[in-house]
Amino acid sequence: MVKLFIAQLYDRRDYVKTMLIVAEENRLQDKVREMGYNYCTAQEISEIDGYEIEVRPKIN
C-alpha cells in the first residue's frame, strides 16, 4: 500500500492556495519549496474519494 500525504500550502499572506498530495513525506518539503510556498502542514490519509481546493485564512 502506498502512503499518501496531503499538505496545505500557504502564500505570504497566509492564505491556503492549494492542496498537494504526495506519495512520500520526505518529498513534501522539497515540493513546497519548489512551488514557492513558505508553510505547510502534512497529514497522512488512508484513502481519498476526492478533495476540494480551499482558500481561507490560516488558523493558528
Q: Model-predicted segments: where are they?
A:
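Short, mixed-charge low-complexity intrinsically disordered segments
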Residues: 16-17, 34-60
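Short amphipathic alpha-helical segments that mediate assembly, nucleic-acid/protein binding
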Residues: 2, 25-28
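Short aromatic-glycine-(Arg/Gly/Cys) micro-motifs in beta-strand/loop hairpins
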Residues: 1-15
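A short, exposed loop/beta-hairpin motif centered on an aromatic-Gly-Thr core
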Residues: 14-26
